[in-house]
């Protein structure tokens, strides 16, 4: 009996996952995730150099981050660009060096382009959440500016804190020394989860529950790690881009990876936004089913009462007939007595 209950529970759980998957597919088609990802990839490539230039300029403004730029570059290019990271790093560093030599007007233009990317991300995510409200221009600008300026500082501070904690004697001279390499290997995954979680909770205008955002962030981070390994394997084992484009193969490789990355980000957003809708639909289905069952039981009760009253009524009528016959027999008996 217990085994049957466990099997039914597992079956219902798998069916609910399948139903949620179908719900996500309908949302993907309705929101046109592939088109949104292509738009964001295009804007990202246009604003990649400005954002990197702003990041490094913000880090250089704080002396504590003076020796962390190379570590930050290596961390970003090694963990977020699965293939051709060295070539992309060389090109981007050259572009950033050229951009930093520009005039004040050019620097302002770079800032505007970087803000355009953040604005595009904001609009894409809020469209997934079906948000009709809009933020005020001052609020949007302040939020975009905070992300653009404080984001690099927070990333640099986290890397500095991580390197400091790892260098402590507590981790090097105790049994925890074997845990340190495992934690360092898991750092990209942890950073991805934290970044996705912050993105899914802060950017949407609607209120997002923490558990829903955490589920979307975990799925997006796992897909991101799998995507990095799969894309790196494809590029290294099937070098079709290098055979076709030659020295320019880095450009389409970078564009395809940025597109895949944005698809993963939007998939996590769809999961986070679609989960409360699916749970609400399931709740409505249960409530309607319960109401229908209660209505059926109410309609069946009078029918059963009438059925139960049938034999009693027949017995009562039979008794009445007997009583009537007895009453009719009484005058006949009186007449017979008089004749006697």
Swiss-Prot record:
Residues 295-308, 323-340 have a biased composition (Basic and acidic residues). Residues 309-322 have a biased composition (Polar residues). It is found in: Cell inner membrane. Residues 292-340 are annotated as: Disordered. GO terms for cellular component: plasma membrane. Keywords: Cell inner membrane, Cell membrane, Membrane, Transmembrane, Transmembrane helix. Its main location: membrane. The chain crosses the membrane at residues 5-25, 45-65, 102-122, 141-161, 179-199, 213-233, 247-267. Pfam families: Virul_fac_BrkB. It comes from the Bacteria. It is a multi-pass membrane protein. InterPro entries: UPF0761_bac, Virul_fac_BrkB. Belongs to the UPF0761 family. This is UPF0761 membrane protein Spea_3909. It comes from Shewanella pealeana (strain ATCC 700345 / ANG-SQ1).
């Amino acid at each position: 009996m217990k085994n049957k209950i466990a099997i039914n529970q597992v079956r219902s759980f798998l069916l609910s996952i399948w139903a949620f998957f179908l719900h996500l597919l309908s949302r993907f088609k309705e929101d046109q995730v592939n088109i949104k990802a292509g738009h964001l990839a295009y804007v990202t490539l246009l604003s990649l150099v400005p954002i990197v230039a702003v990041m490094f300029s913000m880090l250089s403004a704080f002396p504590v981050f003076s020796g962390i730029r190379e570590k930050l570059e290596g961390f970003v290019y090694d963990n977020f660009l699965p293939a051709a990271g060295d070539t992309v790093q060389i090109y981007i560093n050259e572009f950033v060096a050229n951009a930093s030599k520009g005039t004040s007007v050019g620097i302002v233009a770079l800032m505007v382009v970087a803000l355009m990317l953040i604005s595009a991300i904001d609009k894409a995510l809020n469209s997934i959440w079906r948000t009709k409200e809009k933020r005020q221009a001052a609020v949007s600008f302040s939020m975009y500016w905070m992300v653009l300026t404080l984001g690099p500082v927070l990333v640099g501070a986290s890397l500095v804190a991580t390197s400091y904690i790892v260098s402590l004697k507590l981790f090097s001279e105790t049994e925890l020394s074997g845990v340190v390499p495992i934690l360092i290997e898991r750092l990209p995954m942890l950073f991805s989860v934290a970044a996705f979680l912050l993105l899914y909770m802060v950017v949407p205008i609607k209120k997002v529950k923490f558990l829903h955002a955490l589920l979307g962030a975990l799925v997006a981070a796992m897909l991101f790690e799998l995507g990095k390994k799969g894309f790196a394997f494809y590029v290294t084992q099937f070098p079709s881009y290098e055979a076709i484009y030659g020295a320019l193969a880095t450009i389409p490789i970078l564009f395809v990876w940025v597109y895949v990355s944005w698809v993963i980000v939007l998939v996590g957003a769809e999961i986070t936004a679609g989960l409360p809708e699916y749970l609400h639909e399931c709740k409505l289905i249960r409530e309607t089913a319960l109401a229908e069952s209660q209505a059926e039981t109410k309609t069946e009760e009078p029918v059963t009462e009438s059925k139960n009253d049938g034999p009693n009524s027949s017995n009562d009528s039979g008794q009445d007939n007997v009583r009537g016959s007895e009453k009719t027999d009484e005058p006949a008996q009186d007449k017979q007595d008089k004749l006697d």
